[in-house]
Amino acid sequence: MEKEKESSGQARKNLMEFDRDLVISCPCTQSLFTYVMTKYFTIVNDIKPQYHYTDINGFMSIMKNKELWATNTRFLNDETECLEGLLLAQEIIREYLETCIDKEKAFLYSFYKVAQDRIDKGSKQNVYSISFCEDGDLLSQWRGYGKRGGISIGFDLTYYETEHQGEKAIGIFNFMDRYHYETVIAEKREADDFLPADGEFWAKLRKVIYDKDEQRKILDDLIDIGIEAVRQGNIVRNEENLVNDIMYSLDYLLPTFKNKGFEEEKEIRYIWRDDGSRKIYFRERSELILPYIRCMIRDCNCQELKIFPVKDIIVGPQARQKEVIDGIKYFLQCNGYEYLIDKVRPSEIPYRE
């Protein structure tokens, strides 16, 4: 049995090494992106529920429209978001430049320049995310809502039971861009029972990485893949295009890098990259204009869910907490969510003036 486990482990190791070698032999956008997605994105299927913090208006909108809003990461609470990852990449590049051969310098200088351009212009203008926390009753989160209090909605967005051809099956939730759904998918609903979403709109939950050593390890690996590709003469076009291919993957990866000071949040994110095809909406918050994408919660075939995947509703500490809870329960009753009334509960953190 132990030999079988050892053999299986070695096979997995060899497969990963083969995958990396394959990327080096053909370092294109797709191979790099697949490598990053399979190796470095931590898919979260064991954390149930995942909590989304919002205010009372946000709660009612989510429940009425069965959608969440993905906000442009440029306007989130960590001002250094994504920038720290680019600065770390530049630090690694400078270390490589001390020992690399001339053949590799063009790639490294090009990478450094692109990273600097992103830093100067704002690295995150095309990246949107929806944030969740592992903990639904965090004082640091409630503080952001002040005396008005907030609400955390506990979602189970991993798997759900469905039926296919009369048999029970497991489905995966899908966040669908409402604009894409209304302009592309909705027209096909009557003609086709299976409506796969565009890969850009289909995302899985990813854990945020707070440890700088882990962030460095990931960036070092991607830069080293580029160097190896140059060294072996595997560049498809030129060094600049290779850098752009790597940066495409980093657009998804860098939003999972956060400063260790935010580690208490234990944040989990859905991440999208806007390629110009999405409809961007705008809203006001704290005297700022926030760009966002409307994301419907659907099943993996883009069909409406019979049961909305909410498992817990926590009302944050506030002066009129009992009245808020009563109002939420009545709202749920009047909007077809009777099965969620017993899920509403107060925060265990006491309210203080």
Where is each model-derived feature located?
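Partner-binding and oligomerization surfaces adjacent to conserved cores of proteins
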Residues: 2-353
